[in-house]
Swiss-Prot record:
Its main location: plastid. Gene3D superfamilies: N-terminal domain of the delta subunit of the F1F0-ATP synthase. F-type ATPases have 2 components, F(1) - the catalytic core - and F(0) - the membrane proton channel. F(1) has five subunits: alpha(3), beta(3), gamma(1), delta(1), epsilon(1). CF(0) has four main subunits: a(1), b(1), b'(1) and c(10-14). The alpha and beta chains form an alternating ring which encloses part of the gamma chain. F(1) is attached to F(0) by a central stalk formed by the gamma and epsilon chains, while a peripheral stalk is formed by the delta, b and b' chains. The lineage of its organism: Eukaryota, Sar, Stramenopiles, Ochrophyta, PX clade. It is found in: Plastid, Chloroplast thylakoid membrane. Keywords: ATP synthesis, CF(1), Chloroplast, Hydrogen ion transport, Ion transport, Membrane, Plastid, Thylakoid, Transport. GO terms for molecular function: proton-transporting ATP synthase activity, rotational mechanism. This is ATP synthase subunit delta, chloroplastic. It holds the Pfam family OSCP. It comes from Vaucheria litorea. InterPro entries: ATP_synth_OSCP/delta_N_sf, ATPase_OSCP/d_CS, ATPase_OSCP/dsu. Disulfide bonds: none annotated.
Amino acid sequence: MTNKLLSIKIADPYAEAFFQLSLSLYIKNNDPDLFYQLIFDIQDFLKLLKETPELDNFLKNPLNSNILKKNILNKIIENKFNLQTINFLNLLIDKKRIDTIQTIGKIFLEKAYEFVCIKFVEVWSTIELSQKQQENLIQKINILLGPIFSEPSVQFYKIQLTLMLDTNLLGGLIIKMGSKIIDLSLRNELQQLGKKLDITI
């Protein structure tokens, strides 16, 4: 079993547990805002780790005690995150699973996005997309995905874009939706042409 598959196998039960907790709080309190708050918390925490590698490395370091990790973490997030999220992160520290939080968070968000009909789409481009270009892209993705048929109405997915720059593309876009990748980059077109002409690009 590869490290990635092992990480997913370890992470999935924790992601599912937090997802079920989020749903139970939503249903019990009839409060969708609380459900969305937990989603936003995980989004923000993953972003925090990405932007602060020092914190990420500190939490992953087995030489740091659980108490120290929780003290540092709680000082950073106690006034920003919901108590349920904080308790969950502390649990991961106690279970020595905080090092898999990126995988846990990603799986949780996929489950949550699917529940609320949100598609998390990653887009790589050579230049920043304008608001109009983003709106046009969302429309095209919705056409590609098709409508959701649910009684008593038909609706479309809510598309959440994560935009990233990659100058190596030369032009065009790469779109990733779950395990599906749509490569519309000029680099890919040149590579395909190169294969036909037996040229390495």
